[in-house]
């Protein structure tokens, strides 16, 4: 997986911009494919542009998944953690973007929000009610 990602990056000859998606085989992971995206890095206050780039991450992944014939996608909390997007605003963008995409593409892809931290579980649990 790491070698395939390195080949993709070498072929591009530049870093992947925020908001786009790529797909690779999953190799030894318990799935068939991995969708890769780069979220916005937050330094200071979250702006409209940050929110738009984060939404683009989710839309790009969903479009690529649909084009690749996938029926389900599990999303982690994109751009939180190391990239410092605050958890609740990131979850709001994720849920809104996925719901909008699913309304326009009914029945195409099941989405799972896979969270690692209790705080994210609480946020998503509250927002998805």
Could you describe each region identified by the protein language model?
Residues 1-67:
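Glycine-/small-residue-enriched capping loops at alpha/beta junctions
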Residues 42-129:
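Phosphate/ribose-phosphate-bearing ligand recognition and processing surfaces
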């Amino acid at each position: 997986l790491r070698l395939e990602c390195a080949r993709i990056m070498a072929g591009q000859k530049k870093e992947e911009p925020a908001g786009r998606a790529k797909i690779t085989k999953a190799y030894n992971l318990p799935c068939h494919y991995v969708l890769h995206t780069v979220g916005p890095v937050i330094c200071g206050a979250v702006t409209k542009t940050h929110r738009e780039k984060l939404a683009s991450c989710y839309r790009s992944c969903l479009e690529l998944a649909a084009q690749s014939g996938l029926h389900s996608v599990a999303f982690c909390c994109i751009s939180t953690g190391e990239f410092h997007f605050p958890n609740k605003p990131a979850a709001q963008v994720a849920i809104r973007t996925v719901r909008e995409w699913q309304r326009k593409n009914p029945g195409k892809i099941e989405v799972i929000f896979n969270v690692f931290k209790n705080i994210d579980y609480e946020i998503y649990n509250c927002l998805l009610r």
